[in-house]
Amino acid sequence: MAETVEVLVPGGKATAGPPLGPALGPLGINVKAVVDDINKKTAEFNGMQVPVTVTVDDKKNFTIEVGIPPTTALVMKEAGITKGSTEPGALVAGDLPLEAAVRIARMKFDGMLSYDLKSAVKEVLGTCVSVGVTVEGKKPREMIQAVNNGEYDGVLVA
């Protein structure tokens, strides 16, 4: 029967230490090979925590599935910040172009509850509220209202 290990690793910088090593060691597979493969697959997410699922079958073969980092991590990377605001709504941690919010929405679309790109972008803008990031210099709630009013329909074409 296949064993599955789900972990959150730093993109491109996974090591054989915790959380991977202790989880994979008892399964009897080459942990270094798994770590090298994970680092190759997560290199584009450098500096972000990435969800990874390692499945090991009875013959000690492994497959690696790389998830998409949390929306918060993607927003912070696109905004060029390492931490969100300590007081979202009062202190601004950074600014995000609307195009970046659309790009994040497209990246995360399959895992979202939204039916269309417009709703997915509003979900990303909601995350911006929590992180304390403005969008195009506006507060995220103002931007959500503008999206609802159709001001950005040209940008939000799927």
From Swiss-Prot:
Keywords: Ribonucleoprotein, Ribosomal protein, RNA-binding, rRNA-binding
Higher taxonomy: Archaea, Methanobacteriati, Methanobacteriota, Stenosarchaea group, Methanomicrobia
Family of the protein in this entry: Belongs to the universal ribosomal protein uL11 family.
Gene3D superfamilies: Ribosomal protein L11, C-terminal domain (1.10.10.250), Ribosomal protein L11/L12, N-terminal domain (3.30.1550.10)
Cited CDD domains: Ribosomal_L11 (cd00349)
SUPFAM superfamilies: Ribosomal L11/L12e N-terminal domain, Ribosomal protein L11, C-terminal domain
GO molecular function (one): structural constituent of ribosome
Record PROSITE patterns: RIBOSOMAL_L11
Pfam families: Ribosomal_L11 (PF00298), Ribosomal_L11_N (PF03946)
Entry protein name: Large ribosomal subunit protein uL11
Organism from which the protein derives: Methanoculleus marisnigri (strain ATCC 35101 / DSM 1498 / JR1)
Annotated GO biological process: translation
Subunit structure as annotated in this protein's UniProt entry: Part of the ribosomal stalk of the 50S ribosomal subunit. Interacts with L10 and the large rRNA to form the base of the stalk. L10 forms an elongated spine to which L12 dimers bind in a sequential fashion forming a multimeric L10(L12)X complex.
Main function: Forms part of the ribosomal stalk which helps the ribosome interact with GTP-bound translation factors.
